[in-house]
Every structure is written in C-alpha cells, then in structure tokens.
Amino acid sequence: MMKQTIHINCDLGEGGEFDEKLMPLISACNIACGGHAGNLETMHRTVRLALENNIEIGAHPSYPDRANFGRNHMEMTAEELKLSIEGQVLSLKQIVESEGGKLSHVKLHGALYNDAAKDRNISKVVMRSLEDLGDDFRLFVPVNSQLGELALGRFELYYEAFADRNYEDDG
C-alpha cells in the first residue's frame, strides 16, 4: 500500500501576527517578497523562522499592488511584469541564501496566481521570469491551469488544493 501524505503550505510574511505559531504546524511556507506585502525586514525574519523550524521556503510574488494586497488584476506590459516577478523572487532567494538556506519553490499570490491560471500570455511571462532565475525550485500551480500546462516538464510541479474551497471533478 502506498503511503500518502499531505504537504501543508502557508502564506507568511504578510504582516500577520501568527507566523511564529504556524511554523511548527506546516511543511512549507510561501513568503511575501514585496509585491503585495513584505519587505526586507519581514523577509529576513520569516526566513529565519522557517529555517529554525526546518520548513521549506518559497517565494510568493504578486502584482506590485500593496494597496489591494495583490488581489486585483493589474495591467502591465510583459516586460514590467517579468521584471517585477524576477525582482521579488530574486530578493527572497538572496535573503534565503544569505541565511544559509535554499529556495525550494515559488507560488504566485492572489490575482497573479489566478490570472496565470487562466491567461496563457501571463503564464508565458511568468515562465520567462522563472526560467531566467534557474530551474532548481518547484512551482505550485492549480490543477488544469495554463501555468501548469506551460511549466510541465520544465519545473517540478506541486498541484495545489485549498482546504476551505469546494472543487468540481475537473479540479
């Protein structure tokens, strides 16, 4: 019989007050890296907490939309979006490495996550951004998403489900 496990991942470094209490309960964290929330101080603090708790560390880039917590679609040129994603992921990657860790994954946040799931052009920009940063990390994607289709075979994928949502047979 095959052993099945649940990988529990949580968005952290977003200004919440329970990051420290959540760390021992999860296997991975997605750290806000400046787009919708977070700054150098919160990234360093959250990375240290994750390393102390032996938690996998992921980047959680978003549209540069702090006013709406990254929940609204933003019109950006492909180049603007690419540079924004690269800048956010690279900032966190450098912090993780400076603290002696390794970036394990990337999970988009909010509207960017949803847009990349549905819009092939946005997915292509995301892929170009991530490929320019290397391929030594996993990518969290929704089932049956444009981003998942494009990333298949290029990145190791984790298909994600949310415990508080209902799902149809197609994911």
What residues fall within each predicted segment?
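Hydrophobic faces of well-ordered beta-strands that scaffold small-molecule active sites
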Residues: 6-10, 29-31, 57-61, 104-108, ...
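Charged helix-capping and loop-helix junction motifs
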Residues: 119-125
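Glycine/small-residue-rich loop that forms an oxyanion/phosphate-binding "nest" at active or ligand-binding sites
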Residues: 66-105
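A short alpha/beta connector and helix-capping loop motif
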Residues: 15-43
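Active-site rim beta-loop-alpha module in soluble metabolic enzymes
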Residues: 144-171
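Glycine-enriched alpha-helix->loop->beta-strand junction motifs that scaffold or abut catalytic
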Residues: 25-29, 51-53, 129-136, 152-158
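Acidic (Asp/Glu)-rich catalytic clusters
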Residues: 20-26, 45-58, 97-100
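Catalytic beta/alpha-barrel core
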Residues: 31-36, 115, 134-144
